[in-house]
């Protein structure tokens, strides 16, 4: 077993949520809605604490899924002064027959899932009819995470006599 630590910057996820909520507000403004209806959708720095809580919940959900496929998985959230959004560490043990690129792919999928799930929670608090769009994105990301965790590298037989020993 190989220990893997995935490090995710919480500010990156929060920035995605801020930009996507700004796009939603802009689309509403272009649709002719009054400013009071567009401002409510856009997340601001005042909403950061609530959004960080959504991010932590989403990452913990992803860690729970990893625990079903790998050894017990832990997600730790650490906030530092230079990083206002905090850093998230996800730690688990990976079998030897997992692809080497699994950790990088998992990091991207978990980051995408946390952003979509957190944005869905945000939309549920401000505009419930737009939350389903982000829910389907989060469900696709969860399916991708499960697919990544299920993948294994198959042993390859060598051509020479001494290469036909398979190590697991």
Write out the residue ranges for each language-model feature.
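Short, hydrophobic/amphipathic alpha-helical patches that form generic packing surfaces
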Residues: 60, 109-125
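Short conserved catalytic/interaction loops centered on acidic-Pro-aromatic/His motifs
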Residues: 127-137
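Short, well-ordered alpha-helical segments in soluble proteins
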Residues: 122, 126, 142, 146-149
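Short acidic, glycine/Ser/Thr-rich loop/turn "cap" segments at secondary-structure junctions
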Residues: 94-105, 120-128
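Conserved short "hinge" loops at termini or chain/domain junctions
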Residues: 1-103, 137, 144-168
């Amino acid at each position: 077993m190989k220990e893997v630590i995935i490090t995710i910057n919480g500010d990156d996820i929060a920035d995605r949520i801020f930009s996507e909520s700004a796009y939603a507000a802009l689309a509403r403004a272009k649709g002719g809605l009054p400013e009071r209806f567009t401002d409510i959708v856009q997340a601001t720095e005042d909403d950061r604490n609530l959004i960080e809580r959504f991010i932590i919940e989403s990452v913990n959900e992803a860690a729970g899924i990893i625990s079903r496929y790998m050894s017990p998985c832990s997600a730790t959230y650490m906030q530092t002064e230079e990083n206002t959004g905090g850093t998230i560490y996800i730690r688990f043990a990976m079998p030897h027959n997992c692809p080497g690129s699994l950790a990088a792919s998992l990091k991207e999928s978990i980051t995408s899932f946390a952003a979509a799930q957190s944005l869905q929670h945000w939309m549920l608090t401000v505009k419930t009819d737009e939350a389903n769009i982000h829910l389907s994105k989060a469900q696709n990301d969860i399916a991708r995470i499960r697919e990544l965790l299920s993948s294994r590298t198959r042993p390859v037989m060598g051509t020479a006599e001494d290469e036909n020993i398979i190590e697991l």
